[in-house]
Amino acid sequence: MKNVNFSSLTTLICAFTASLGLPGCIPLPNYPIEPEIEFLSFNVDDSENAVLSIHFTDGDGDLGLNQSDTLAPYCSTCDHHFNLKCEYDELRNGEWTHIPLIPAQGQVPFYYRVPRVEPSGTHPALNGTIEIAMNTWYLQSDFDTLRFRITLEDRDLHISNPDTTRFIVK
């Protein structure tokens, strides 16, 4: 009969048992139910197309819209049809000036529908990066410096903190 070292076996069993509980020891993210955003980057390629990148969190996992989300409050004429809004500002004579864009007057605002994001696992919290391809990203104007003020809205109509891009020169 082989002599078993119970001290080593006990240590091994305790270490294995403790490792089973480790995933439960990792704290779950504790994000607020309102989306939170942070501007990451704004890059323009050689074709003058731009990509806006923002980081987001959402504590209850209700971010994004399906294409079929077309009834109120998400209908095409409703205020909540778009869930990512980039308000356009220009630097005019040393002061930032908001330039409102009015669709009824044929102007196209920098508004987007971010697709629905499904939480992975059992915890609903979301954390990730949104990248928006902006084929048109500036207005024809005598002023050459702009920025975007960005907000993100979830399906419960919670609006994120606003964040602002760095200044952008056309």
PLM regions: where:
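Intrinsically disordered, low-complexity segments enriched in Ser/Pro/Gly/Ala and basic residues
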Residues: F6-S7, A18, D46, L52
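C-terminal motif of bacterial Sec signal peptides marking the signal peptidase cleavage site
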Residues: L20-G24
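Bacterial N-terminal signal peptides that target proteins for export
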Residues: K2-L12
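Non-catalytic macromolecular-recognition regions in eukaryotic signaling proteins
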Residues: P27-K170
